[in-house]
Amino acid sequence: MIAEGRVTLNGSKVNTPATFLPNLAGVTVDGQPVGATEQARLFRFHKPPGLITAERDPKGRATIYSALRNAMPRATPRVMPVGRLDLNTEGLLLLTNDGALKRAMELPSSGVPRTYRARTFGDVSQAQLEDLIEGVTIEGVRYGRIDADLERRTGRNQWVVLTLTEGKNREVRRVLEHLGLAVSRLIRTAYGPFALDDLARGQVREVDRKELARFQAGLPAAKP
């Protein structure tokens, strides 16, 4: 573009790629101002079960974007999911317009915790759940540290709360099934400091930008 004379700075053509630009003020391409990088934004979405975490599905199933069309505030930028939730998993799904923030939150090395509540059937002890703190290998796949606790039990039915810092495919379900439990409902209740709270199914709410900036400041790869 520079060689073609399409880039200008304060009305003068830029002749070399080595031109120092402290910011994008006064820069145009084909006569159009180049905007500053859009500020990172983060949204909490209460994903209902039965939606695919994808933009489109080759099988024609409903995706999260089907639900988001009417749920997102007007003039919202295009957003991407942070991680994913399986078809039948519900609860907190974070959405952002910032690719660097998305990647940083997904990386296991960032140590961002994800918390789930699982309704299960079967026999399990608190001691068995506490063993997951050391991680577990299932069919050759290593799953890292998981903090797990029995929350409530009625007969052989119980709710289990689990917190982990990685997001391998179907990790929570596979670990619980490995313990002999059948999972009938799985809800993500938190991702980092951002909680589902009282957000109704299908609703979206933006994270306060000051709160997001504080969180970003502690991330190793996505500082504002």
Language-model-detected regions and their locations in the chain:
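Basic, flexible Lys/Arg- and Gly-enriched helix-loop patches that mediate nucleic-acid binding at interfaces
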Residues: 1-224
